[in-house]
Regions:
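N-terminal assembly/attachment segments of tailed bacteriophage virion structural proteins
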Residues: 1-137, 170-174
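Heptad-repeat coiled-coil amphipathic alpha-helices that mediate oligomerization/assembly
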Residues: 139-172
Length: 174
């Protein structure tokens, strides 16, 4: 599912970015917060209204001076509709918040939720935000060899079942 998310840069997030720049550093996004309270977000927010889960960013990259791509994996027993997302800096400040009364996704206890975001940060100075991830590559391309092996095993299993079906049919005829 692909939905355009337009997060609101928070006042405290903007201040954190400028403070980092004044010391010669870049602000660092390290976590994604997920919650279930839908609303119209405000620049004055300091946290999600009802945060249900906070996940470390798995991987990320800079697309250009104002755009970053980041991924995360929401796993665990918690179940809820994702209606609010916060992008959290290393110091705990919420840089940006997105929310809507229509849910973005459902976080199931049974299936991990893979999240991927492209954030355009045109309201911030160029290259002022970096991504700090765990190094886990969640790209499907990284899992290509394993997926191909599973697919080959499935096809082999189906071929055995078809062969068995033909044998049963022959026995029933005779």
């Amino acid at each position: 599912m692909s939905k355009a998310l337009i997060p609101v840069i928070t006042t405290r997030g903007l201040a954190a970015v400028f403070n980092a720049q004044n010391t010669g550093l870049s602000a660092e996004i390290t976590h994604i917060a997920l919650g279930d309270h839908g609303r119209t977000p405000s620049k004055n927010e300091v946290g999600l209204v009802n945060e249900r889960m906070r996940i470390a960013i798995a991987d990320g990259e800079r697309i250009d001076d104002y755009q970053i791509h980041l991924t995360g994996l929401a796993d665990g027993d918690t179940e809820f509709w994702v209606r609010e997302i916060g992008f959290i800096l290393k110091d705990g400040t919420m840089l940006a918040v997105w929310s809507d009364t229509d849910p973005l996704a459902y976080k199931s206890a049974e299936v991990p939720l893979l999240l991927a975001f492209d954030l355009v940060l045109a309201a911030l100075p160029a290259n002022s935000v970096n991504i700090i991830g765990t190094g886990a590559n969640l790209s499907l391309a990284a899992w290509g060899e394993q997926l191909a092996a599973v697919a080959a095993a499935n096809v082999d299993n189906m071929a055995r079942h078809v062969e068995l079906l033909f044998r049963v049919n022959d026995l029933e005829k005779g």
